[in-house]
Amino acid sequence: SAASDVYKRQAVNRASKVIYDRSNSAMSQIEPGMLDWKNIFKNAQWFHWTGITPAISKSSADACLEAIKIASDMGITISTDLNYREKLWKYDCDREKIMTELTSYCDIILGNEEDAEKHFGIKPEAIDVNKNGENVKAESFLSVCEQMLNKFPRAKKVITTLRGSISASHNVWSGILFDGKNMFKSKEYQITHIVDRVGGGDSFMAGLIYGLIHFPEDNQMALDYAVAASCLKHTIKGDANLVTIAEVKKLMSGDASGRVVR
């Protein structure tokens, strides 16, 4: 039987370095036709995929496209975290062509400037470098968002996380959402005692999906929920965000400094 995907991480006094061991994993060997997607998606409301799946093998990319097309035919909301991972794209392929086709079916896109550039060649345009850092960041992301929505007309929202690294254990964390008309920005959280930042992006996306389902008419609330949920994840060891809805909402309603209360 095939092994599960494995990544390894060591705690030392330097930046995190992830080592992937996904070759010959079960996911890398999945092929179109192996799963009954119509039955799997029965009563489903949402399907999410990440850029890691098509990166690990051609067959997993083909299976991902199969799932996405069936989900689309069934009227299911589709989201992606573009997740560019250079170490994973090892097989001979046209990465931009693969990711463009997969992303064309998406309603919600999560990614940063690097994801957009590496996957689609999209870069910020006409940015005034004389503006202060925060304004340049927001302006550059707006430029990327507008290009992404032009390239992928089905998409309704483009989202990114903003991480400022003060040190290995102290980060500033926030998020931005653009819906084609308005840009929403969350408050910033000062995370001063990071336990584990691995899984921060996944917990953000999980929180965003929850927020968009439960607050469908309130982009700001959905974004704030996602950022608060992922902020709490930084205080938990491992991938899983072991927090409750009540804990996330409590942090959302906390003081303006956004400091995590332990």
Regions inferred by a protein language model and the residue ranges of each:
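Short beta-strand/loop segments at the ligand-binding rim of alpha/beta enzyme cores
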Residues: 75-82
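Conserved phosphate/ATP/ADP-binding segment of small-molecule kinases
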Residues: 74, 88-182
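Surface-exposed amphipathic alpha-helices with a cationic face
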Residues: 65-72, 149
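Conserved post-catalytic alpha-helical subdomain immediately downstream of the catalytic base
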Residues: 168, 184-255
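Active-site beta-loop-alpha junctions enriched in small/polar residues
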Residues: 23, 52, 83-87, 114, ...
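Structural motif
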Residues: 19-21, 46-48, 79, 110, ...
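Short, small-residue-biased leader/transition segments that mark boundaries at the very start
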Residues: 2-7
